[in-house]
Amino acid sequence: MTKEELYLKTIFCCIACDGNIATEEVDMVRDLCAKDRIFHNLDSEEYLNSWITEINEQGGAFLQTYLKEINSVELNEQEQLLLVSLAIKAIEADNSIEYAEVKFFKRYVQNLL
């Protein structure tokens, strides 16, 4: 997995972890992918559709696998801060912060650091 894919998957997992992917969250992802040079080489729609299929099939196991993936990736401090920033943007995108999102974010940060 490239770092760009990891960044996008981080956003996806943060918007999916509460069991509901809101329209505002999808709009934020599309807007970010269209405007941010980090994602210019990715077919974000293809990745998102694939991950939606996977999370529908695997449920929470998909998120657990992601947490293991970030634990095994070598990231410098700047990349870690970018991931945290992207995660926060994703969680705040629907203007509602759910307990499941806070819980996932805590586990995410523990695995990241």
Predicted features along the sequence, with ranges:
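Small-residue-enriched hydrophobic alpha-helices in membranes
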Residues: 1-113
